[in-house]
Structures are given as structure tokens and as C-alpha cells.
Amino acid sequence: MKVILDVNIILSALIRDSTTRKIILNSEFDFYFPELSLHKIRKYKDYILEKSGLSEEEYDKILAILFKYIQLVPTEEIEKNWDEAKKIMEHIDKEDVVFIATALSIEDSVIWSDDRHFEKQDKVKVLKTKEIANLS
């Protein structure tokens, strides 16, 4: 299964050695993340360090390990679906247009997110952590 990761899923995997991290590291899924959203992970680095108790070195190591299992989707691949994604999310959450555009760019993909607002759209299938865990 092709799975687009919402930024909060990656943050969760960084904060603790959780089900989320285990799924990313051990499942047979193909994981994707929009290159365009890497800044969001960097933006929360201090928060992650505080919550997790990780040193910067440990944080960098875990991030590098996670991204061995996550394929970055170049912005150019996402741009062709940006307008459609924007229409889908314009009255829901404009911050998440990038994840819808990424899913539209990767055939037969789903989004992994625990954010409820994704339920307000019906163009892209969205699975919660519990559902992903049951499939892995």
C-alpha cells in the first residue's frame, strides 16, 4: 500500500518509540512525504526535543533512520494536482493542501493521519493510526 504521511505522524514517530515509529520501520507499506513539507518537521524540532527528551544527535539519527523508509515526493510532482487539492481543502484546512496534492499525485495512495478534518473531504482515502496498525 502507498501511504502519504501527514506531518503529525512523523512528529509522533520522532517523539517516542511508539506504534507509529514501529509501523514506519517494520511494515511493508511504501511511505511518502512531500518534500515541500520538510520545513514543518524542522519548525517543531525544539518541541520534539523537549517532549521526547532526545539529544540533538539522537533526534538527527532517528530522523535519518525514519527517512530511510520514507520517500520524498518532489514539489514538481505535486504541483500538477495543486489546484484540485486546493479546491478540496479550501474550506477545511489550507495547511493540508500539500498532503491531498501528494495523494492525488501517487496513484492508489492513502493518507495516514489522525487529524479529523480530513474526514470532511471524500476525494482521498484517509486512515487513522489504529487502521494502519490493523493492516500492517
What would you call each of these model-derived segments?
Residues M1-E35:
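Short, well-structured N-terminal submotif of metal-dependent ribonuclease cores
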Residues I10, S37, F99, H117-F118:
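Alpha-helix capping/helix-boundary segments
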Residues N26-E28, E35-E84:
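PIN-domain endoribonuclease scaffold, especially VapC-family toxins
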Residues L38, L104-S136:
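Acidic, PIN/NYN-like endoribonuclease modules and their adjacent C-terminal/linker elements
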Residues Q71-V110:
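Active-site neighborhoods of divalent-metal-dependent phosphate/nucleic-acid chemistry enzymes
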